[in-house]
Amino acid sequence: MIGVYTADDIPGSVKVGHLKPDWDTMIPVGHVTHYLGDAICLIAAETPEILERAKALVKVDYEVLQPVLDPFEALKEDAPRIHPGIQPDGNVLAHEHLVRGNAEEVIANSKYKVTRHYETPWTEHAFLELECAVAMPFDDGVFIYSSDQGTYDTQHECSMMLGLPPEKVIVENKLVGGGFGGKEDVSVQHHAALVAYLTKRPVKVKLSRQESITVHPKRHPMWMDITTACDENGYLTAMKAVVVSDTGAYASLGGPVLQRACTHAAGPYLSLIHI
């Protein structure tokens, strides 16, 4: 055994995150976990066998709270606030409005119009190579080999967590091994960096397939109500849509994902939209 580390051992910010610092590197004692992939503590060992034996000795007492399981529950006035310290006004991360021309008037005057409800499920990215990072002490900071999709985001969030200037955190990105959006957030990089910084030893953190599925964010489920209109010749004239996206427990890149969904909703075919 090398050591067991908790949120109390983090020298800088416990929380990280691309758009909002809402994701705990480790959940402090007495705080709230938000999904199955939240880290409670880190265990470092010389061999996988010792690591598994040590993991089996960890006991956690949970108080079960009422979960919020979809965006429609989260939108209710009496819904629990997911991140009250960061987003005290509610559970909505982002609004997007795209308006071009007077779509409502054109729809009303079009020969044909169709309104349908569509849903897409969350999607596992299923990249071939699993998340892995190797970190080592380097010049009063850390050097990280990573295989993520955001080298500078990894540097920024690890330096914030360690309380170091960015130049003390060097990140070299190796081959990603597939990502498709599933490796944009930090997953193992900050944990490897923290243990390497604390122990002054090289550290590898690698997820199994089941751990990977549990930990990394998924493609966002969406609920869409779309009205599409066309003229008597079948030429599309305008579109109106409402899109609700589920970014899950944390902000991640939920705002830009919603923006992209709205931007692409009409494809290249319609110049009059209201989304």
Give the predicted meaning of each segment.
Residues 21-51, 180-232:
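Glycine-rich and small/hydrophobic secondary-structure elements
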Residues 9-12, 128, 151-152, 176-177, ...:
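Short acidic loop-to-helix transition motifs that present clustered carboxylates
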Residues 12, 50-72, 96, 153-154, ...:
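Gly/Pro-rich active-site capping loops and adjacent beta-alpha segments
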Residues 1-7, 42-61, 133-199, 256-261:
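Alpha-helical support elements that line or immediately flank enzyme active sites
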Residues 1-2, 30, 37-40, 46, ...:
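Short coil/turn connectors at secondary-structure junctions
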Residues 1-90, 113-116, 198, 264:
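Flexible, low-hydrophobicity surface segments
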Residues 80-162:
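Helix-loop-helix junctions that connect adjacent transmembrane helices in secondary transporters/permeases
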Residues 7, 167-174, 201-210, 237-242:
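Beta-strand segments within the central parallel beta-sheet cores of soluble alpha/beta enzyme folds
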